[in-house]
Regions:
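Short, surface-exposed "cap/lid" segments of acyl-processing enzymes
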Residues: 2-47
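Alpha/beta-hydrolase active-site loop
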Residues: 26, 47-65
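The alpha/beta-hydrolase serine catalytic core
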Residues: 90-199
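Short hydrophobic segments within beta-strands
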Residues: 15-20, 73, 97, 157
Length: 199
């Protein structure tokens, strides 16, 4: 992120944190629907949670020197990284799209899909899967050792057919946090069709 990338239209900015395979330029798509905010997207190292946390905190700290109101817009696993990185920072509000809210549950689900037990994962350290993810025991331990305490007012956009976060998981999160849930019927985890994007 460079200083020239940050417009100074107001004292309010949204920090956009993309999901897996995304990039900072996705933030551009939100400018027309959120004209009262400056919006900046960041790219970050998503290879391990602590690396993502470091990069997101650095971006936040830079913005905090120039903006008095920082909100967060995050997508998919970007939501997990945002909450991990910014739970101790002053965030005005958050909007999470198809968020990964319980990363430990997702990892355990992926282990089940791959037919991998925790004992096997611990012994081997890392195991590639047929669905494109590499299971990591170190990653799982980090998640367990670094719980999140999220108190930011949060809006969640959830797709009815999300295959990564269950409806039960999102409803449990909403009931125990200062959060509001909007569900798109027949939506998928990846909001990509015209109908889904317009929603």
């Amino acid at each position: 992120m460079k200083a020239k990338d940050i417009a100074m239209a107001s004292d309010k900015i949204i920090l956009y944190i993309h999901g897996k395979g995304g990039n900072a330029t996705e933030a551009d798509g939100y400018r027309s629907i959120l004209p009262e905010y400056d919006i900046i997207g960041i790219d970050y190292d998503d290879s391990f949670p602590s690396a993502a946390k470091r990069d997101i905190q650095a971006a936040y700290d830079k913005l905090a020197r120039r903006y008095s109101h920082i909100s967060v817009l995050a997508n998919s696993i970007g939501a997990y990284f945002a909450m991990l990185a910014l739970q101790d920072r002053k965030v005005s509000k958050a909007a999470l799209i198809s968020p990964i809210l319980d990363i430990e549950r997702l990892i355990c689900d992926m282990m089940l899909w791959a037919g991998v037990t925790e004992e096997i994962l611990e012994k081997q350290g890392g195991i590639p899967t047929t669905f494109g993810e590499t299971l990591s025991y170190k990653y799982l331990c980090y998640v367990r050792d670094n719980p999140i305490c999220w108190t930011v007012p949060t809006e969640i956009l959830y797709a009815e057919k999300d295959n990564l976060t269950s409806r039960n998981t999102v409803e449990q999160f909403v009931s125990s946090h200062n959060a509001h849930l909007t569900v798109m019927e027949n939506g998928e985890h990846w909001f990509h069709t015209d109908e889904q994007l317009n929603f």
